[in-house]
Amino acid sequence: MLTNSPFMKTFFGVDLSASPKKKSAYAVLYEDLTCVTGFFKHDDELVEKVEEYSPEAVGIDAPLSFPQKGYYRLCEKALRRLGIRAFSPLFEGMRSLTLRAIQLRSELEKRGYEVIEIYPGGTQDMLGLPRKNKSREKLYLGLRRLGLRFPESRDGDLLDAVTAALTVFAYKKEEYILVSSSDGCRLVLASPSLKEALLQIKG
């Protein structure tokens, strides 16, 4: 059973679905690398969880803006140059996800929380972890090897939520890569240097 100090800083990650009819996953990462995970459907449920844990920031796995022109944002093009596959917010099924994420960010920011756009698949690429569609088992084991302690689960959405929380941790510990573009897109990935920082925490 995982136990946590109420005085530790927390970092909140969200693997958001496009519709509240489907479950979404969240993860709360503590400074000692223990992690609490769970599911929600409606935005107000997530807002309650965020207020319960009062995180340093919230990372949402979804676009938080639309392209100003064309099909892709400039940050998606930058990711492709890094060899990271990413979808346009205008891709089928992504538009409703993006609208939901933008609304959720607004609700959280009104309550004083910092919200950042993150991309678990990109962070997994940066850290040498397989994506969930390649091997959920290897992704699970890879996150555990980094020192993260979370309830045993091979659920792909939960693993992405844990990766999202880890990306927020990296952002606050200044072990991150910012993909920023003139069209207003700001997307955060964990830097490969995060591995060394995590080893120091593991001791």
Where are these regions (language model features)?
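Phosphate- and other anionic-substrate recognition elements at nucleic-acid/protein interfaces
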Residues: 2-203
